[in-house]
Structures are given as C-alpha cells and as structure tokens.
Swiss-Prot record:
Keywords: Kelch repeat, Repeat
Parts forming coiled coils: none
Keyword Repeat belongs to the record: yes
UniProt name for this protein: Putative F-box/kelch-repeat protein At1g12870
Segments annotated as Kelch repeats: 199-243, 297-341
Organism field: Arabidopsis thaliana
Lineage per the UniProt record: Eukaryota, Viridiplantae, Streptophyta, Embryophyta, Tracheophyta
Keyword Repeat: yes
A cellular-component GO term for this protein: plant-type vacuole
Pfam families given in the database record: F-box (PF00646), FBA_1 (PF07734)
C-alpha cells in the first residue's frame, strides 16, 4: 500500500514536471514571436486553454483580459457557430441546494464537448429559470430564494446580483393568494446587451392592468424602473425573445386576441406588434416565440394534435409576418435512447409515434438545410433536440430537466 502511494506520488510529480517543461518551452518559443502573431494564435484557441495561459505571463494576462481581445475572440466564435453550431444544456441536480450543470453539445457530432458544474454560495431551490445566452453568459434565477446570478460557464465565473425592487416589495408585503395572482411576474428575466449589459424584468403590478419594468444597471449594481411602460398586462408564463436589439413578450388576452410587446433595449421604449393572422389561437399559452437567424418567429404549440407545424417570421418592417417553414412532425420514426446526463446516470427513454406529434421549439438553422428543434417529452421527463431536413429526422439528443440555449463563449467579464 505504501509502495503504491509512493509510485503515485512519483508519477504525479513526473507529470507536473513535464507540464512545467512544456510551458517553459512554449514561453521561450513565443517570446521570439511578435506580439501580434501571438495574439492571432490566441484568437484561435478555446476559452479553457486561454484561461491557463493567463497565469503564465503578465503580458499574456493583459492581452487576454483586454476588452479588444475578448470582443475579437467572441466574433470568431460567433462565425464558427454558423458552420459548427453548439448549444448549451442547463440541468439541475435535485438536492436540498440545487447544483447547476452547464454542458456544451456539438450539433455536428451529437456529442458533449465540455461541462461546468456550479454550486453557488447560496443554494437554489426548485424551480430555477435560465435566461437566453448573451455573449455566452447566462442569468440564473430562483423565485423561491430570490437569488439572481450571472454566470459564465466558459470561465466558471459568476456574480450574485441584489434582489429586484419587486422581490423586496413582495417580501415585505407577505402577499395573499389574490395579491400574488394580480402581481405575478414573468419568471424568465431577459439578459441582453446594448452599449452595456442589461437585465430586464417585466411584471404585472396589480389588477388594474398596470405593468412595471425594472432594469438592472451593472455599473451601479442597482435596479431602476422604466417610466415608459406598456398599458397591457403581460402573459406571465413565457420566456422573452431577443433579436436585433429588441425584446419581445406576449400580452394577456384582450377582446379574444393577444398582441406582442416589443422593447427597444437601446432607447428603452415599448411598442405594440400584431401576431400572425393565420395563427388561430388567441390563448398565449398555445403559441410561442423563438429567434431564427436573428429574426423573431412564432408558432402554435397547442390545440388539436397537428401533424404539420408552421413557423412564421416577422418581417423587418414589423407590419407583417411570412411563413418560412412547414415541418412534418411525423417525419421521425419510433426510437429509443440511452441518456448520459450531467451526473453520470444512465437512463433509457422511449418516444413513440404519438409522442412526436407535439410542437417543437426551433433552436437554430444548421448550414441552411436543417432546422434544429427542441422537443419536450410528453410525460415531462425531459427534452431532446432533433434535426430535421426535408422531413427526415437525422439525430436526437434527449436531456432530462434541461434548458436549451444557443452558446458562444466569452473570455472575460469586465463589462459586468
């Protein structure tokens, strides 16, 4: 036993020495290269490798932590995402204090690329909500604990934010069930970037059809109210969509119809948009929004079991919609999968032909030929991604209790 421990110590010491020698050779080799050449090399490396290089040289750290470099690195990652799309799967581990796992999936190879597990100082309690990605950064929110975190899975950095004024007010109020029904917020916060990063929280303040909006200022580390607010109550059970500097929400039903509320994140002014006239449903829980190619899209999610799913896109003029995809939901055959989740538990999940007749959320367009869909298993056991091309399913990735977001990695977080 002692001999084995000594051998392990020798092997560990040898490996450490080898790494130091490799880094030393790298430092010597790179010192003979012009700074701009070294920077170009860094731009082609993944974030994980760059984080290691930061500790090897003060000059390298200065380069890698500069806003100029991080923005160039992000643009390259965004261009790469077009040809080599990736998504982030966010899952929660069921403990008294929930751990949250971020896993990157390649949609080309249908494989996991990297993962990061966060155990926050103040644990979350179910349910938790994750925002869409903004430069590879996410906002994680727990209504029960009132905790809000901004998280960068690539660098494993996170920052806790102070509670919104709405949260403080509700905590002091100790509301009744009727009060909660009137003041129920949109659970999903919107995390966007104008000149600086912004966190936007829209909620219904009372029964008199008044809506309030709070914006978190990262520089001031404080929440503030927007004075120009929509005169419509917002449908609470939705995830806001973001495209071209605008955020979108559904209103509650008015006179048997719903509308789309839009917020310009630069001017912080709201405007009202119509929904596609050919989408028959007037119930906001029966339709959904998504972003495809940086444009707002809409589709029906409920109603009679439909074989065909239609996806509509808002035109740039914002006065009309156009149908861009018609998807046959029965293009997939019976299948089963072995699922490896973020905690090394293997499960067996089955989908039948009946399960497939459920509207799916478009995630991305892959090389202009395939549309990538996130499909919720009808028994609510999880989600899967499916890639459709000309009514032919190519691949599936089932993921238990997952939020699925597009992903680009941001190296630094100085702006927030």
């Amino acid at each position: 036993m002692v001999m084995d421990e000594e051998k392990q110590a020798i092997v560990s010491s040898s490996s450490s020495s080898q790494r130091k020698r490799r880094y030393k050779k790298l430092m010597i080799a790179s010192s003979s290269l012009p700074d701009d050449v070294v920077e170009e090399i860094f731009l082609k490396l993944p974030v994980k490798a760059l984080m290691r290089f930061k500790s090897l040289s003060k000059q390298w750290r200065s380069t890698l932590e500069s806003c100029y470099f991080s923005q160039r690195h992000l643009k390259i990652a965004e261009r790469s995402h077009v040809d080599h799309p990736k998504v982030m799967i966010i899952t929660e581990k069921w403990n008294p204090d929930i751990e949250i796992s971020f896993r990157t999936i390649s949609l080309e190879s249908v494989s996991f690329l990297s993962s990061a597990l966060f155990n926050f100082p103040r644990g979350f309690h179910h349910p938790i909500y994750a925002s869409e990605s903004c430069d590879g950064i996410f906002c994680i929110h727990s209504p029960k604990t009132q905790d809000i975190y901004v998280v960068n899975p690539a660098t494993r950095w996170f920052r806790q934010l102070p509670p919104a004024r709405f949260q403080i007010f509700m905590h002091k109020l100790n509301p009744t069930l009727d009060t909660l029904r009137d003041m129920i917020p949109v659970n999903h916060l919107a995390f966007v970037k104008a000149t600086d990063y912004k966190l936007v929280w829209l909620y219904n303040s009372d029964a008199s059809r008044v809506t309030k909006c709070e914006v978190f200022d990262f520089k001031a580390n404080a929440w503030r109210y927007l004075t120009c607010i929509p005169s419509y109550r917002i449908y609470h059970d939705q995830k806001p969509a973001s495209a071209n500097g605008t955020l979108y929400w559904f209103t509650e039903t008015y006179n048997a119809e719903i509308k789309v509320i839009a917020l310009d994140i630069h001017t912080e002014i709201f405007r009202l948009l119509p929904k596609p006239s050919l989408i028959a449903s007037s119930e906001p829980s029966h339709i959904d929004m998504c972003i495809i190619d940086n444009s707002l899209c809409m589709y029906e999610t409920e109603g009679d079991k439909k074989i065909i799913q239609e996806i509509w896109r808002l035109k740039s003029s914002e006065d009309a919609w156009e149908k861009i995809y018609t998807i046959n939901l029965l293009s997939s055959s019976y299948c089963h999968f072995h699922v490896l989740d973020g905690y090394n538990l293997t499960r067996l999940c089955y989908w039948t032909q009946k399960d497939l007749v459920e509207s799916s959320t478009p995630v991305a367009i892959y090389k202009d030929k395939k549309i990538i869909l996130s499909h919720r298993y009808t028994c609510n056991l999880g989600k899967r991604l499916e890639v459709l091309e000309l009514h032919a399913k190519l691949s599936n990735i089932p993921c238990p209790k997952a939020s699925i977001c597009k992903r680009d990695a941001l190296l630094v977080h100085r702006a927030i």
